Amino acid sequence: MDMIKERCEMDSRKSPMIVIIGKKDTGKSFLARDLLFNVQNCFPAGLVISPTEAVNEYFQAFVPSKLIHDKYEPGKVQNFIKRQFAAKQRFLKSKASGQVFDPRAFMILDDCLYAAKEWINEESTRFVFMNGRHLDMMTIITMQYPLGITPNLRTNVDFVFILRENILGNRRRIYENYAGMFPTFEMFCDFMDQCTENYEGLVICNNVSSNKLEDQVFWYKASEHPPFKLCDQSLWADNRPFQSAMMAADDYNATSLRKKNAAPSVWVRKEGGGRE
């Protein structure tokens, strides 16, 4: 981690955009936790959107539950952006008083591609990619499919962590869309084979000024860490059990499942009391 910080400036003050690519059970969330552990004292606030939180209770161990959501809704991201605008203004004003306010925050979108058409085309998502660093917002996006991010947004990614992938088609997609610094696809596959065993990862650093391959590509393995907590202590003071918006939503009732404009169901009672 120290080498990546030194060589690639993975620093909370730089508010990097980080993408983690890997199929299920390759350690994406574990890697995100490892990265956050290394900057645990840097962020007073944050936002987590993870569809599996109600099942695995992963992020609530180190992020206040009030900051975690398991259903992507554009309004949540928009409100977070507004929060960062206000924090940035407060920071600029606080410098004059000598009591500097810390505006930094993190945002995690954990496997949100179930709502891909919704979030990737949403204006607030594009704003985070294009301008998040200007609002002191570090963003970590985990995803299983390499093309989950459109080309115009990929150019704003600072770090790409590539985890184990044995499907040749997906390897080629990763190579063509994220790893063009490798002279050949075969060389890229050799690096992947060497760097992604045992939950290790291949790291591509896009914000270096060098064109040398050794300055842009690294190996990294996430570590297990003792319990820790992110965010300002005031956010933990009244921390309560996580409430799932996904489980509370009544999306599976008969009315919502009925096809649009379909005629209502009609029950016909037959002689003898049966239904047809």
Task: Give a label for each model feature.
Residues 60-73:
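Active-site regions of enzymes building and remodeling cell-envelope glycoconjugates
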Residues 10, 49, 66-68:
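Intrinsically disordered, low-complexity eukaryotic regions enriched in glycine, serine
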Residues 59-62, 153, 194:
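Short, conserved catalytic or adaptor-binding loops enriched in Gly and charged residues
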Residues 56-58, 213:
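Short acidic, gly/pro-rich beta-turn/loop elements at beta-sheet edges
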Residues 4-8, 15-44, 51-55, 74-186:
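Conserved P-loop NTPase motor cores
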Residues 63-65, 157, 177-179, 191, ...:
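General N-terminal targeting signals
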Residues 1-18, 197-276:
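Conserved P-loop NTPase motor module
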Residues 172-210:
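P-loop/Walker A phosphate-binding loop and immediately adjacent motor/lid segment at beta-alpha junctions
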